[in-house]
């Protein structure tokens, strides 16, 4: 990978694309591809790429964008006409993250560009490389491919460029133009929706006058009833067979109140059907029934409150706390009774037990239990007690060493509790005594050294004897 950076020329210019997939940093080769870089920077300054989509995605190959129409056929350069290709021997499609101009043929560069997603040797000397994606933003570039794609390599939910920011402009003479973006072509469905509604020509119909009158009446009624709910009474006000008097009298207090409030309206509307006496009788019946119902409801509510007093949550918690206290107290009493029974049993056993080893064992046990009860369980008191015991042991040890007797101590004293402190460790002297080499003993080993002069003489003498024997034979 290092040889790639050595081969590629240094960059001069930087642009930041803010996309829906994240920010993408692009460094430009403005010396190697000046026309393409000038075109790209000026379009960014003019906000030409803002809200444009990446209309083509080929996984593992390229991601293409820069077309304001979003179709893949639009977009133009700052020069007004397509500009020429700019190839360089040190710029090759040998890795991902390169930025190049998209074109439909030689010298046909406009506003569209693409990112490479891998090695693409087939694009060399066909498309102008003018920049590269740098840093960790290359991963945001790869996120542009994480979309569903149709058969025509178009993403269904495409990412888009939100805005562009020129971080370093190598061309000081660029003056942004004030241009309008070409609008996207609207689909056929939207065009159909925007078509104006046709006007009705009633003169063509044989019953045109009647139809026109009905149309006007319907429009007038719909305007008057706009925003209101409609019922059969609203639509059929003039029907004499419909009456506003309910067939079944309401038993609820709210309905009775509504009937009292609307009494004047009902009386004014139905004077034709109901006389004044009948109206008074009806009102009296309704008032009596209303009083009766309200008294019964109050009575029932009072009985319900007496019978069912709602128990609050706090009252329940108090009851539970009292119950737990009772249980804990009972458990403590039971434990105390058990301990008393056990103590009685122990005392009975001690009285019944004979003197001897068992009695001595029990005395020792009681002694250590008493010591254990005296010990503090936790805290500074336990620590102080431990240090006091340690100091006591040290003083006892130093005293025993100082008072060590010169004479040997018998084994009975050594086995005593404090006798081992003053005991001196002594070993039996088992060193071997020196023996005389000339004295033969059962433990004496024969040492033979061939370099010894005595042994040499013996060997020579034995050799002479052997020669003489051979000569005699």
Swiss-Prot record:
Motif Cell attachment site location, chain numbering: 252-254
GO process terms (BP): protein folding
Phosphoprotein in keyword set: yes
Comp. bias (Basic and acidic residues): 178-193, 231-241, 267-348, 360-372, 426-438, 458-473
Modified residues (Phosphoserine): 347
CDD domains: CWC27_CTD, cyclophilin_CeCYP16-like
Region (Disordered): 178-197, 203-383, 401-473
Protein name: Spliceosome-associated protein CWC27 homolog
Organism this protein belongs to: Bos taurus
High-level lineage: Eukaryota, Metazoa, Chordata, Craniata, Vertebrata
């Amino acid at each position: 990978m290092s040889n790639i950076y050595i081969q590629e020329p240094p960059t001069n210019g930087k642009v930041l694309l803010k996309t829906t997939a994240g920010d993408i940093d692009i460094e430009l080769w403005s010396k190697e591809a000046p026309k393409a870089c000038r075109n790209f920077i000026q379009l960014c300054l003019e906000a030409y790429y803002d809200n444009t989509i990446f209309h083509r995605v080929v996984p593992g190959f390229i991601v293409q964008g820069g077309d304001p129409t979003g179709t893949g056929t639009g977009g133009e350069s700052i020069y007004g006409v397509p500009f020429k290709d700019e190839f360089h021997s040190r710029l090759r499609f040998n890795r991902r993250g390169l930025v190049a101009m998209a074109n439909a043929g030689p010298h046909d560069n406009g506003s569209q560009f693409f990112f490479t997603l891998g090695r693409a040797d087939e694009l060399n000397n066909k498309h102008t490389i003018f920049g590269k994606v740098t840093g960790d933003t290359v991963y945001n570039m790869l996120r542009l491919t994480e979309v569903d794609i149709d058969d025509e390599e178009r993403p269904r939910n495409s990412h888009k460029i939100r805005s562009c920011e020129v971080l370093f402009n190598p061309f000081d003479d660029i003056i942004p133009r004030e241009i309008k973006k070409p609008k996207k072509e609207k689909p056929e469905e939207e065009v159909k929706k925007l078509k104006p509604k046709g006007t009705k020509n009633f003169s063509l119909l044989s019953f045109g006058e009647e139809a026109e009158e009905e149309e006007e009446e319907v429009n007038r009624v719909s305007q008057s009833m706009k925003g209101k709910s409609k019922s059969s009474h609203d639509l059929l006000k003039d029907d004499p067979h419909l009456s506003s008097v309910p067939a079944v009298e309401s038993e609820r207090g709210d309905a009775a109140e509504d009937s009292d409030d609307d009494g004047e309206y009902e009386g004014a509307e139905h004077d034709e059907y109901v006389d004044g006496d009948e109206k008074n009788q009806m009102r009296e019946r309704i008032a009596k029934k209303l009083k009766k119902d309200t008294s019964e409801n109050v009575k029932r509510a009072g009985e319900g409150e007496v019978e069912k007093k709602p128990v609050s949550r706090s009252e329940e918690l108090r009851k539970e706390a009292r119950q737990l206290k009772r249980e804990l107290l009972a458990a403590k009493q039971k434990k105390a009774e058990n301990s008393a029974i056990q103590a009685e049993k122990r005392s009975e056993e001690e009285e019944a037990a004979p003197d001897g080893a068992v009695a001595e064992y029990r005395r020792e046990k009681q002694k250590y239990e008493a010591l254990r009860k005296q010990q503090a369980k936790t805290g500074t008191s336990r620590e102080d007690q431990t240090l006091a015991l340690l100091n006591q042991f040290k003083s006892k040890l130093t005293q025993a060493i100082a008072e060590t007797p010169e004479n040997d101590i018998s084994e009975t004293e050594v086995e005593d509790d404090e006798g081992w402190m003053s005991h001196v460790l002594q070993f039996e002297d088992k060193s071997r005594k020196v023996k005389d080499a000339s004295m033969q003993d059962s433990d004496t080993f024969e040492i033979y050294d061939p370099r010894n002069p005595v042994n040499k003489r013996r060997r020579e003498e034995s050799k002479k004897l052997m020669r003489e024997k051979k000569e005699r034979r």
